[in-house]
A protein has these predicted regions:
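Boundary at the C-terminal end of the N-terminal hydrophobic targeting segment
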Residues: 20-24
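Amphipathic beta-strand/beta-sheet edge segments enriched in Tyr/Trp
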Residues: 98-138
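Bacterial N-terminal signal peptides
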Residues: 9-19
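A short, hydrophobic beta-strand-centered structural micro-motif
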Residues: 25-30, 79-108
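N-terminal segment of the mature soluble domain
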Residues: 37-91
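Bacterial N-terminal signal peptides that target proteins for export
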Residues: 1-10
Length: 161
């Protein structure tokens, strides 16, 4: 009985000495260039691929519903994503990831790029931005793997932040 008690106390002590914490990351995917009537699975596919990688890396992940815009805003995003950013911040997110899934024209069902921007919710500063090719997979399964590969690049870049 004493051995069990000692092991339990040692585990508890280790947990107190080395606190376990994970950063919380909130995702918002915005499809740009499509008409409102267009139907595509790529937004959900990219969102899932990116979120899976972050989750597997130990982050707590949340998301907002996929949105649509006629075109990607140039710089100031506050008028477009302010509510989603505010909700993520109130929920305790440390980072806010925006993925602009860009389509060449309104009739296209295949995207050509995914522009990912990551903001620190405490400072509201852009800490990462990169464009990834999208729509290059021969099928949805391959496209999902492309999204996951992009997520791995992003997660590896976040380790130093």
């Amino acid at each position: 009985m004493n051995n069990k008690r000692l092991v339990s106390m040692a585990v508890l002590l280790l947990l107190l000495i080395f606190p376990v914490s994970a950063s919380m990351v909130s995702f918002l995917v915005i499809e740009t260039g499509l008409s409102e009537e267009s139907v595509t699975q790529y937004g959900s596919l990219w969102e899932g691929g990116l979120m899976d990688v972050f989750f597997d890396a130990g982050h707590i992940v949340t998301n907002s519903p996929i949105a649509r815009m006629e075109k990607r805003p140039a710089e100031d995003l506050s008028g477009y994503i302010g509510v989603d950013f505010y909700e993520a911040t109130r929920s305790g997110a440390d980072y806010f990831v925006i993925g602009f899934l860009e389509f060449k024209n309104k009739d296209s069902h295949v995207p050509n790029a995914m522009i990912v921007k990551i903001y620190n919710t405490n400072t509201e500063k852009l800490i990462f931005e990169r464009s990834f090719p999208a729509g290059t997979g021969r099928n949805l399964g391959e496209e999902y793997q492309i999204a996951k590969s992009a997520g791995q690049v992003i997660v590896s870049n976040m380790k130093g932040m």
